[in-house]
Design a protein with these regions (language model features):
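Non-catalytic, C-terminal membrane-associated alpha-helical segments of glycosyltransferases
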Residues: 232-311
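A short, conserved alpha-helix in the catalytic core of glycosyltransferases
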Residues: 170, 175-177, 181-186, 191-218
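Glycine-rich, basic loop-to-helix element that forms the pyrophosphate-binding segment
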Residues: 68-89
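Short beta-strand-to-loop acidic/aromatic patch adjacent to the donor-nucleotide binding site
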Residues: 91-102
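Short beta-strand-to-loop element that shapes/binds the nucleotide-sugar donor at the catalytic cleft/hinge
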Residues: 126-141
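Short, well-formed alpha-helical segments that are part of the catalytic scaffolds
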Residues: 13-28
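A recurrent flexible, glycine/aromatic-enriched loop bordering the glycosyltransferase active site
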Residues: 156-177, 243-246
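A conserved acidic beta->alpha catalytic loop
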Residues: 42-52
């Protein structure tokens, strides 16, 4: 592992994006300057001056700012960055990096160690998932996980424990993909709209026999920006027409992505997800009551002041 392409996409989060890039550079300078980094970041229609602010900063590694259409969402922006990195060529791997993370210095020690561990124990390189924590509370937010129930997709998150752990899939907040994995799987599926493709890619790599490892220590700080109840309280109060719109919205329930993920990863789930997707919109409270029970949530109350976690 010598040359790494860092893949990013951004949309109107200038301060967070600059903080992310600064933390990336600071940790790299302290611990592992032997690695060559090249940043490929898609500016997906930013109107807050993100691109110009990046150009005005002084970075010791090259930063390639790519123009997006403004409608790429996360998946499209990352594909745009990944294609540019592949076109340049010569990289040993690719680091998916969300622009709202603050990279910790331990990451630069754990990352090359993962490469060595993988080679020694599996005879090939793989995917290395970085875990993130809330900067204020220290709570585990994103990382690797296993599917406990493949029907409901209930998962068990695996916090870092000081050793390398294997997992079935992972979040893409700060995750490294070795070149040999890309040669086999290609890059992200371009049919996804917004999120979900990180779970798809890591799970398919796992199914293809590539090691998917969780790094031993926290790799970054990142707040969980998903609502605890998945937006259900607001969803319940919407009229039917708006619930159907939200069902298909890339920033809503995104039925398109749910169906695509099922078709690619668990094909037998496809008809179930298609039917339950519309049941969710037609009879939301009944659907979620059954759904939460299936996921092992015993106390179910629909008090508007109560949150219900899907995790």
């Amino acid at each position: 592992m010598n040359r790494i392409a860092v893949l990013m996409t951004c949309h109107n989060r200038k301060d967070k994006t600059l903080r992310c890039l600064s933390s990336l550079q600071d940790g790299w300078r302290i611990t592992n300057r032997e690695l060559f980094l090249s940043i490929f970041i898609t500016d997906d229609g930013c109107t807050d001056g993100t691109a110009q602010a990046i150009r005005e900063q002084s970075f010791t590694f090259p930063v390639h700012i790519l123009q997006g259409s403004g409608n790429l969402y996360w998946n499209g922006g990352m594909i745009n960055s990944w294609k540019a990195a592949r076109a340049e060529g010569g990289f040993d791997g690719y680091l998916w990096l969300n622009d709202d993370v603050v990279v910790l210095s331990e990451f630069w020690t754990d990352l090359p160690a993962a490469d060595i561990f993988c080679q020694e124990n599996y005879g090939k390189k793989g995917i290395y998932v970085g875990s993130t924590k809330d900067a204020d509370t220290g709570a585990f937010t994103y990382g690797g996980f296993n599917y406990v129930n493949k029907l409901t997709l209930k998962d068990q998150l695996l916090p870092p424990n000081g050793s390398f752990q294997t997992c079935e899939a992972g979040h893409g907040n700060i995750t490294y993909v070795s070149e040999n994995v890309v040669n086999h799987l290609g890059i992200f599926c371009d049919k996804y709209i917004h999120g979900g493709t990180d779970h798809d890619y890591t799970y398919l790599a796992h199914k293809a026999g590539f090691p998917v490892l969780i790094l031993p220590h926290y790799a970054a700080a990142c707040r969980n920006d998903h609502s605890k109840d998945g937006g259900r309280k607001n969803f319940f109060s919407l009229p039917l027409r708006e619930r159907l719109h939200y069902l298909h919205s890339p920033l809503g329930l995104n039925l398109h992505n749910a169906l695509l993920f099922s078709r690619r990863c668990f094909p037998w789930r496809y008809p179930i997800i298609l039917i339950t997707g519309y049941l969710k919109a037609l009879f939301p409270k009944t659907y979620y009551r059954c759904y939460l029970r299936a996921r092992g949530v015993k106390q179910i109350s629909w008090d508007p002041n109560t949150n219900h976690s899907c995790s």
